[in-house]
Amino acid sequence: MSEALDEKSFDAKSFLKTVTHQPGVYRMYDAVGDVIYVGKAKDLKKRLSSYFRINVAGEKTRALVKNICKVDVTVTHTETEALILEHNYIKLYLPKYNVLLRDDKSYPYIFLSNHHHPRLSIHRGTKKRKGEYFGPYPDAGAVRESLHLMQKLFPIRQCEDSVYANRSRPCLMYQIGRCLAPCVKELITEKDYEDQVSFARLFLQGKDRQVIASLVEKMEQASQSLNFEQAATFRDQIQALRRVQEQQFVSHDSEDDLDVIGIAHQNGMACIHALYIRQGKILGSRSYFPKMPSDAELTEVLSSFITQFYLNQAEGRVIPSVIILGENLGDDAAVITETLSDIAGRKIELKVNPRGNRARYLKLAQTNAMTALTSKLSHKMTIHERFSELRKALNLETISRMECFDISHTMGEKTVASCVVFNQEGPFKQDYRRYNITGITGGDDYAAMGQVLERRYGKPMEPEKIPDIIFIDGGRGQLSRAYNVVKPFMDEWPKQPLLIGIAKGVTRKAGLETLIFITGEEFSLPSDSPALHLIQHIRDESHNHAISGHRAQRAKVRKRSALEDVEGIGPKRRQALLKFMGGLHELKRASREEIAKVPGISKALAEKIYDALQHG
């Protein structure tokens, strides 16, 4: 939080005398020195003067002006520069009165490497590796689905480079027809593999018809050469591709590369639904719920979304040549178009009121936006009802933030603690945390709980992040340990959270939970109580978050090769074994005699290796 400013009222008249008519960006601060609004202007003096008129339009603007204690101005050469600077400031300060796009995920791509035998894989983040990138896709699930389809259509390798480099025999993917096994010589010619890579590239570019035409030609050539087995392979590929074509809606303009942005607004909340269309096909879609002041205008919401969404080049986002909008951007349209064109290095068009197939796309985006918004509002009402009931049940004035802790381990191994956070909109996942617990006796849940609470609350906390309730998934013992750890920290806080233990019933069935207070008082809520449902929700979230972290830790241990624990096997011998056998799976199936055939491996060492692999 910034240093507090002088609380006397802002002298707008004196300030405006110093403001220029040039383009630029302004930052407005409140009494404690926090940036509460960032804006841009073609004419700074004209724009800033509009805030301090006698009759200010809009409830949001009036509330903003009441809180202004200071304004900083940055002059820019052009309006385009101002738009980019405004975007950077909004990302930096996350001002209260700005519309904020809550989207912190980078978009995934399908990556085709430029190796001798290229590999298909999923990619996120900056494009540092040499190769070709296809996308972006709306989420990792869409990429995995596409890669799974690609394995069936064009069986080029998807294995890690380390696996590929150490194989001497084809893997299971080859056996089931999902890979051509370029790792093993003589199974496929260089030309045939290159052809399949070319087909995959064309398919990812949306050029299905070109791929089918080439495959038909190859099938006919194979038939004429009496190579009927190869002709049948090409025929199967053609049929599979045609089945895929039938499942996709394709516009008549097969070269369409565009994003379609639908928007819906209701009860102070907005939903923006984006359809990503590449080569005339719907690549995917996604709904966004920007954080916004309750009375923000639709034009402002959409303008802020477009700016923040497409200027976020760090997310690897591609700006298509055409962006279809469900609402006009008004005065901002020209500068946004110019800015996006400058960034993309080509002409970008923002279009409203489209016709034909584009109108169908927009209607689809608008329908999806309204559907997602209706669902979100319904969920929000349910959450609000549950918070209200819990507040009444616990006799609290307000509940704005709750945190819940749980511990997960297997027989004391790889202990992981979780902390999940709920606010009045439900799970606040960006504040979820996991803690790997170390330095305790395995299985000591009390010590684990003490450690996680000390790590969570032992450092200075922002006042707004101090919870109103801390739930501990456990009984009296866990709650008592938690209180002893947290009490010294709570004494320094401006408010005192309520500590509650959630003890499961004897049968451990949902609905039979007992709530335990630090005073020793216990009580239960009816099984149909909305307050109990909220407690179960946060408890289950914490439990699942801990378990998934624990499983990830266990999986890391299991990935460690059993060979690493065999005395006398260093990196070189380990690599020789894997290369000779064609991987760990094949090595595990080998007999003692077969292992002893590996150069540098004696019979005695082969015996040790065999025993370690069979019983490890």
From Swiss-Prot:
PROSITE patterns: GIY_YIG, UVR, UVRC. One of its GO terms (molecular function) is excinuclease ABC activity. GO terms for cellular component: cytoplasm; excinuclease repair complex. CDD domains: GIY-YIG_UvrC_Cho. Residues 21-99 form the GIY-YIG domain. The keyword Transmembrane does not apply. InterPro entries: GIY-YIG_endonuc (IPR000305), GIY-YIG_endonuc_sf (IPR035901), GIY-YIG_UvrC_Cho (IPR047296), Hlx-hairpin-Hlx_DNA-bd_motif (IPR003583), RuvA_2-like (IPR010994), UVR_dom (IPR001943), UVR_dom_sf (IPR036876), UvrABC_protein_C (IPR050066). GO terms for biological process: nucleotide-excision repair; SOS response. The keyword DNA damage applies. Residues 209-244 form the UVR domain. Keywords: Cytoplasm, DNA damage, DNA excision, DNA repair, Excision nuclease, SOS response. It is found in: Cytoplasm. Interacts with UvrB in an incision complex. The UvrABC repair system catalyzes the recognition and processing of DNA lesions. UvrC both incises the 5' and 3' sides of the lesion. The N-terminal half is responsible for the 3' incision and the C-terminal half is responsible for the 5' incision. Belongs to the UvrC family. This is UvrABC system protein C. It comes from Photobacterium profundum (strain SS9). The gene is uvrC.
